[in-house]
């Protein structure tokens, strides 16, 4: 392992940490503006031009708020839970190829921290491990609303992880690999080669499961204000609460990259649009879709969430895998 590789990897890690932490903060501004537009309001307007400095003001507020730990909390677990959420969100990005290769000063740069041949499995596995953050936070807070939020975390994440895995199984059978780079290369050659045309059902199933994995409306039962206050995060404040928040937004971008790489051609050129710009358009479209859904859809009840998972999405995912296997064997 040469020094150039180590230095390049460290730089990539720092870029991912800095960029997506900043995007998580800026994402709040975009979300508030999008929701305001859809509700015929203005949103943030007073801090800086068009409210652009609201993100900075919110960041200062989080950094300076008191780090309060409840008297009945299990202190070590309570303190480590937000770190688990943020860490798993960023670790999952290590195996995601975000842009095409490019050259700087004769050195070829691969915009991926770790190009492993089990990239898809790694990303899904690390994202699944992220459930321990909200789960431990709720169980260690000594608060009944937080405990209810933790219970919802367990049933929601564990159930929809199965749907996520089954939905990508059919595309994996077609590509013959679980490397995200191989998924991208398989779809080279234009829109006609995108996997969404061969696996439209898998695309829909994976996207719906992505909403549940990221705790976004209509599946935001973990911290539904009208039912469980702030759920698992009820007793958190300051930067510990901010870590949960950063993890959620980072996971939204991760899902956007996964959907783009698996089903929508990844970072291959999109007509006259270069690949790097093309994948950014796709990722930010899905980020906007998360916000659009929040403004348009009501919350679902926990029983409706489980009914949708086990009686609708799960059978459809299994049927899709069976049909794909039959078609490939003919």
Swiss-Prot record:
It catalyses: a quinone + NADH + 5 H(+)(in) = a quinol + NAD(+) + 4 H(+)(out). One of its GO terms (biological process) is aerobic respiration. One of its GO terms (cellular component) is plasma membrane. The chain crosses the membrane at residues 3-23, 76-96, 118-138, 161-181, 188-208, 244-264, 272-292, 307-327. It is found in: Cell inner membrane. It holds the Pfam family NADHdh. PROSITE patterns: COMPLEX1_ND1_1. It comes from the Bacteria. Its EC number is 7.1.1.-. Keywords: Cell inner membrane, Cell membrane, Membrane, NAD, Quinone, Translocase, Transmembrane, Transmembrane helix, Ubiquinone. The keyword Transmembrane helix applies. GO terms for molecular function: NADH dehydrogenase activity; oxidoreductase activity, acting on NAD(P)H, quinone or similar compound as acceptor; quinone binding. It is a multi-pass membrane protein. Belongs to the complex I subunit 1 family. NDH-1 shuttles electrons from NADH, via FMN and iron-sulfur (Fe-S) centers, to quinones in the respiratory chain. The immediate electron acceptor for the enzyme in this species is believed to be ubiquinone. Couples the redox reaction to proton translocation (for every two electrons transferred, four hydrogen ions are translocated across the cytoplasmic membrane), and thus conserves the redox energy in a proton gradient. This subunit may bind ubiquinone. NDH-1 is composed of 14 different subunits. Subunits NuoA, H, J, K, L, M, N constitute the membrane sector of the complex. This is NADH-quinone oxidoreductase subunit H. It comes from Nitratiruptor sp. (strain SB155-2).
